[in-house]
């Protein structure tokens, strides 16, 4: 239903006037104005000649309503006003809202809390997207659940600058693929303490030492290596080497030595206690060498990558004293 509301401020007589037109196929919408109600917290305004007074607060309220109506009809920005106390109201459309919007003072993503301190059952919006992925259909009790965007933590850095031959898109792709691995483990194998991975530039610098000499030899710094033909670039480069690590999943056996099974790259990618990753690329002739370093490092002798749990999603996340347990919509622990 379309309608148009035109507000006119008649300064010469000091009244609030309204002009309206009929919505198509409907009755006219009644508009109430209060022309002579004394304004609160502001001095009464006259027309300068002792004429009738009008209520500035009422005008501001009506103008705000008009701006909201304009935004609902598809406008991205409501018209601004020259009146004191009435500012423009930006109304971004859905396709203008990106992963990097709504940042806080610390230049992090503004976390979007999906629920607080109740077992998560899903509302109509999330249910269709997430319910079939739930292990048992419920998060653990007393868990704060935050929404992720493309498997990126709600608390990830706002910007990831280009370094070590990786641009921002590739870095976010690396995080996305790693967290997909980890979320898949929670859903299919069951663990209540799988941390979400975030980017570390310090680890990226460490990883660069593994590939700087164009050598496919692990230097013992806890890095995972891969070599990819140079025809792969951009996000396809990341997808290619991550798919090779994913192939190790078919041979992975929880509790077995990863070096024997030749699954150490996948095992490290899903090591539950790991919190950060940083990667680097070195171009060497017709090959690209990639290394990723992790912290805390995984593949520890006599330890397993993750522990199955029946306590619910995020039931065993480690949390500082007196702080709430944080989880996300990918079923990964949001660490502090």
Curated annotation (Swiss-Prot):
**Stored InterPro entries:** CAP_dom (IPR014044), CAP_sf (IPR035940), CRISP-related (IPR001283)
Highest taxon of the lineage:
Eukaryota
- Give the location in the cell: Secreted
Question: Which tissues and organs express this gene's product?
Answer: Component of the acid-insoluble and acid-soluble organic matrix of calcified layers of the shell (at protein level).
Q: Which UniProt key words apply to this protein?
A: Glycoprotein, Secreted, Signal
Q: Where is the signal peptide?
A: 1-18
Which protein, by its recorded name, is this? SCP domain-containing protein 1
Q: Which organism is it from?
A: Lottia gigantea (Giant owl limpet)
């Amino acid at each position: 239903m379309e309608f148009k509301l035109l507000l006119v401020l008649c300064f010469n007589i000091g009244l609030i006037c309204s002009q309206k037109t009929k919505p198509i196929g409907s009755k006219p919408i009644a508009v109430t104005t209060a022309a002579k109600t004394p304004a609160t917290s502001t001095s009464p305004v006259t027309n300068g000649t002792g004429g009738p007074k009008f209520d500035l607060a009422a005008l501001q309220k009506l103008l705000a309503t008009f701006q909201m109506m304009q935004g609902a009809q598809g406008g991205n920005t409501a018209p601004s006003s020259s009146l004191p106390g009435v500012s423009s109201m930006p109304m971004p459309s859905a396709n203008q809202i990106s992963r990097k919007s709504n940042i806080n003072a610390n230049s992090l993503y503004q976390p979007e809390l999906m629920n607080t301190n109740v077992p998560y059952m899903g509302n109509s919006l999330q249910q269709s997207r997430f319910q079939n992925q739930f292990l048992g259909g419920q998060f653990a009790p007393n868990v704060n659940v935050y929404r992720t965007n493309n498997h990126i933590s709600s608390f990830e850095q706002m910007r990831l600058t280009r370094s070590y031959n990786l641009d921002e898109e590739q870095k976010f792709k690396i995080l996305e693929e790693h967290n997909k691995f980890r979320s898949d483990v929670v859903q299919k194998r069951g663990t209540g303490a799988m941390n979400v991975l975030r980017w570390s530039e310090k680890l990226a610098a460490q990883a660069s030492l593994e590939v700087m000499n164009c050598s496919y030899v692990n230097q013992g710094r806890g890095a995972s290596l891969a070599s990819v033909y140079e025809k792969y670039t951009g996000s396809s480069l990341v997808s290619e080497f991550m798919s090779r690590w994913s192939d190790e999943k078919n041979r992975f056996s929880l509790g077995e030595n990863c070096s024997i099974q030749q699954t150490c790259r996948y095992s490290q990618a899903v090591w539950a206690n790991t919190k950060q990753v940083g990667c680097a690329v070195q171009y060497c002739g017709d090959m690209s060498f990639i290394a990723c370093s992790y912290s805390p490092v995984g593949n520890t002798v006599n330890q397993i990558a993750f522990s199955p749990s029946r306590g619910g999603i995020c039931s065993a996340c480690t949390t500082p004293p007196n702080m709430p347990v944080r989880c996300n919509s990918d079923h990964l622990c949001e660490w502090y």
